[in-house]
């Protein structure tokens, strides 16, 4: 008995020593604080390598000899994760999970570019100046990778905020031969209105994509890539605070949402379809559902898998796309194109609420982005995006609310209504001859539409 205890004791001590040694070898992102931001920090770039061999353990790469004593495989795909401005000095809360999702998706090198010393500074303009220096540092590493047999087309740079422009500067140093740049809400301040050489642009990589979530504040407003996604119009993300009373979340929620949206695409939680469109209003009106220029591939899927549309996108002029999301994961919504023909003698204006039910579950959307116009025998179209998929749809409830200030009470007479699913190939749902009284629910059982057109 005593020998067994001795053996177990030796094993326990050995394991503890191994864990301690491993903890000493594993590197974490630089963790600073607000005092550091007030004092300002000098730039120091640290490169942390993560692989499937030990996905939770970051290896600090030597700038001089990055491939010695490391698990770096230059023949594999390499993804760089580059953070942005860090006014409080703390590491990004999403970084570890982002690395995990990437390594779960495929075998690759993930390099976290830790430039927290240099990004932590109350002087934003000084941080902007540092972006060129970070890009030069990464250029040196990538050149070493290339010299050791790496293919530039196998490099994917994911840049958040200022990190997006760092990716662009790095790609420009290789004449756009880097495989892919993903820009997550690229920084706007100090970059809006700048010429292509002073910001990210499509020539910086073989494929450049940009996601916009805070273009009215911290993000960039205009097109930057071969394809640009404007989530929920590119500003004011659902679930984010609308007033400063919510504290720091008011400033960072919209901007940071870009990261979580892209992470969800890497994790494959649910696909988000991006519709090419000239404006968010046109998108909401349901006039941009045609993706014929992508032929059999259909509309692009936002995120990690968008590379499937690369060959078509790089041949087109810069493509602007829109989509809507839920306020939390799963972010994808389920879309229907709604077409209505009314037969009132007079023109009516108002808003619609649509509820779908399968008998046990319900999902509802309020179409209130603008007052809809209903003219006699004229088709009114709008896009309805629901929080989740309800199948089979057994009941539909409509509510019509006239535009404020219009009296007496209105009744909207529908010759027919048609709901066409956008995410699947189910047959459109119809109903004929309905009377909607002001602010009253009208529930009916839909039927398969008689033909493909009204």
From Swiss-Prot:
Disulfide bonds join 240-253, 277-288, 291-299, 430-449. The keyword Transferase does not apply. It catalyses: 1-hexadecanoyl-2-(9Z-octadecenoyl)-sn-glycero-3-phosphate + H2O = 2-(9Z-octadecenoyl)-sn-glycero-3-phosphate + hexadecanoate + H(+). It is found in: Secreted; Cell membrane. Its main location: secreted. PANTHER family: LIPASE, LIPASE MEMBER H. Hydrolyzes specifically phosphatidic acid (PA) to produce 2-acyl lysophosphatidic acid (LPA; a potent bioactive lipid mediator) and fatty acid. Does not hydrolyze other phospholipids, like phosphatidylserine (PS), phosphatidylcholine (PC) and phosphatidylethanolamine (PE) or triacylglycerol (TG). Belongs to the AB hydrolase superfamily. Lipase family. This is Lipase member H. The gene is liph.
């Amino acid at each position: 008995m005593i020998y067994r205890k001795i053996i177990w004791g030796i094993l326990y001590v050995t394991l503890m020593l191994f864990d301690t040694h491993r903890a000493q070898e594993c590197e974490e992102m630089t963790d600073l604080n607000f005092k550091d931001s007030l004092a300002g920090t000098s730039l120091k770039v640290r490169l942390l390598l993560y692989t499937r061999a030990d996905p939770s353990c970051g290896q600090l790469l030597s700038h001089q000899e990055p491939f010695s004593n490391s698990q770096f495989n230059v023949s594999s795909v390499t993804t760089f994760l580059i953070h942005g401005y860090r006014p409080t000095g703390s590491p990004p809360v999403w970084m570890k999970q982002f690395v995990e999702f990437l390594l779960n998706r495929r075998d690759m090198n993930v390099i976290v570019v830790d430039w927290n010393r240099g990004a932590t500074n109350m002087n934003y303009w000084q941080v902007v100046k540092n972006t060129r220096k970070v890009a030069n540092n990464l250029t040196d590493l990538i050149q070493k990778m290339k010299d050791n047999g790496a293919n530039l087309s196998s490099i994917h740079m994911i840049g958040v905020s200022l990190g997006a422009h760092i990716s662009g500067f790095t790609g420009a140093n290789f004449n756009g031969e880097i495989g892919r740049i993903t820009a997550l809400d690229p920084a706007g301040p100090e970059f809006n209105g700048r010429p292509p050489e002073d910001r990210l642009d499509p020539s910086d990589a073989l494929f450049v994509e940009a996601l916009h979530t805070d273009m009215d504040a911290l993000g960039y407003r205009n097109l930057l890539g071969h394809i640009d996604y404007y989530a929920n119009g590119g500003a004011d993300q659902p679930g984010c605070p609308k007033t400063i009373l919510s504290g720091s979340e008011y400033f960072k929620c919209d901007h940071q949402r870009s990261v979580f949206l892209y992470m969800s695409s890497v994790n494959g939680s649910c696909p988000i379809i991006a519709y090419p469109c000239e404006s968010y209003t046109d998108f909401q009106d349901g006039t941009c559902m045609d993706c014929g220029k992508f032929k059999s591939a259909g509309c692009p899927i936002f995120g990690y898998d968008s590379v499937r549309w690369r060959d078509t996108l790089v041949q087109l002029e810069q493509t602007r796309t829109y989509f809507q999301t839920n306020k939390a994961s799963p972010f994808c919504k389920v879309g229907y194109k709604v077409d209505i023909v009314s037969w009132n003698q007079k023109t009516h204006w108002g808003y619609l609420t649509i509820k779908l039910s399968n008998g046990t579950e319900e999902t509802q959307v309020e179409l209130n982005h603008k007052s809809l116009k209903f003219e006699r025998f004229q088709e009114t179209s709008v896009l309805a995006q629901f929080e989740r998929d309800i199948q089979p749809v057994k009941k539909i409830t409509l509510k019509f609310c006239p535009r404020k200030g219009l009296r007496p009470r209105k009744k909207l007479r529908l010759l027919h209504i048609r709901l066409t699913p956008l995410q699947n190939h189910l047959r459109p749902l119809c109903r004929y001859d309905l009377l909607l009284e002001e602010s009253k629910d009208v529930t009916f059982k839909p039927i398969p539409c008689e033909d493909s057109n009204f």
